[in-house]
Design a protein with these regions (language model features):
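Conserved alpha/beta-hydrolase
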Residues: 128-150
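Alpha/beta-hydrolase active-site loop
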Residues: 156-177
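N-terminal cap/lid segment of alpha/beta-hydrolase-fold proteins
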Residues: 60-103
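C-terminal catalytic histidine-bearing segment of alpha/beta-hydrolase fold enzymes
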Residues: 282-329
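Short beta-strand/loop motif that positions the catalytic acidic residue
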Residues: 259-262, 266-269, 273
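Hydrolase active-site cap/lid region
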Residues: 197-248
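Conserved alpha/beta-hydrolase "acid-adjacent" motif
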Residues: 274-280
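N-terminal targeting or regulatory segments adjacent to alpha/beta-hydrolase or S9 domains
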Residues: 1-74
Length: 329
């Protein structure tokens, strides 16, 4: 009888660990497995992109209407160069669209977010257009595993490797004549992570814009796990399998601690963001204040995830102009 109870107990414990592991793997896989396409925006170009294509996909009616009614034709660009350049990590070739309109003017590298994504998406194209309207050049890029850049993995590295791609874009711009102090960075959602990490490696980059960025690993881990109806107790399992799948340690995903005192940052976020909660914005703000980081902050009112640029394009454009012109030469 005693032996039977022990067997039952051990079986129960084993089953519990098995379920725990399976749940952790499922969440990690679901988060990190990349869709290499651009989804509904596959084959979109700077002169043809549209927010209407996938407006019906947004479950939030406000976000859907915002994109369905956005006057995209006003923001199309007709001239760009299709460019290729190497990542700073050897063996990886990257693709971008170069909008080099203004001689002797600054340029901003624009980095997209998580899949399905790329320079094809409305967000990157809109930011490029707003910058061009303000007399600032732009380079939109596909990070590794996206768009026309090399596919080297089926799993997202969360910016912990792809920051080298941002540095590759930076090297490319220097090679074609742009000076270090005239190159700024703009990261959208998860794209803000490789942007912040890249800037930490190159202190000559003086202007870094982060739109709807995560700030700290334990916060985003808790947020992501909750989407699957699980508690933070599943965090270690998700982190373990995330490391196996992606080849990076997600615990290192702490962009806030990569901010420096000799660079300038602009953080913007939607106050109603449900994808990347605004507490990440609050975390950045508190960290910057406590560590004397030179930063500006704009919490866009009545805005969800990366909605600010679509809801307030003129204000967004003005803020970018002021920030980049103040901090780039």
């Amino acid at each position: 009888m005693k032996r039977k109870l022990i067997i039952i107990l051990l079986s129960t414990v084993f089953l519990g660990f098995f379920i725990y592991g399976v749940a952790g793997f499922y969440v990690a896989y679901s988060i990190l497995k990349i869709d290499h396409t651009c989804g509904w925006h596959e084959n979109s170009k700077p002169n043809s992109w549209s927010t209407k294509i996938d407006a019906h996909e947004y479950s939030n009616l406000s976000r859907s209407r915002l994109r369905d009614s956005f006057p995209v034709n006003e923001y199309h660009l007709e001239e760009w160069q299709n460019v290729y350049f190497p990542s700073r990590e050897k063996g990886i070739q990257l693709n971008g669209w170069l909008f080099n309109y203004y001689p002797d003017r600054p340029i901003v590298i624009i980095v997209h977010g998580i899949y399905p994504n790329g320079k094809c998406k409305p967000e990157s194209n809109l930011i490029a257009s707003l910058l061009i309207k303000e007399g600032i050049n732009a380079l939109t890029i596909d990070l590794r595993n996206y768009g026309q850049s090399d596919i080297v993995s089926d799993y997202e590295d969360l910016g912990l490797k792809s920051y080298n791609d941002v540095l590759g874009a930076y090297d490319f711009l220097k090679k074609i004549g742009f000076k270090s102090n005239s190159i700024g960075l703009h990261g959208i959602s998860l794209g803000a992570v490789p942007v912040i990490f890249a800037a930490n490696k190159e202190k000559d980059i003086k202007a870094i814009w982060a739109d709807s960025s995560l700030a700290e690993f334990s916060m985003v881990l808790e947020d992501e796990i909750a989407r699957y109806g699980l508690s933070i107790e599943f965090g270690p399992a998700v982190s373990f399998f995330g490391k196996i799948l992606s080849g990076v340690d997600p615990v290192e995903l702490n962009p806030a601690v990569k901010l420096t005192n000799d660079q300038n940052y602009f953080f913007t976020h939607g106050d109603k963001d449900q994808r990347m909660l605004s507490r990440h914005f609050d975390y950045f703000k508190k960290y910057a204040e406590e560590n004397n980081i030179k930063s500006d902050f704009w919490l866009a009112e009545n805005s969800y995830h990366v909605d600010g640029m679509f809801k307030y394009p003129d204000l967004y454009s003005e803020k970018m102009k002021n920030f980049f012109e103040d901090n780039l030469k």
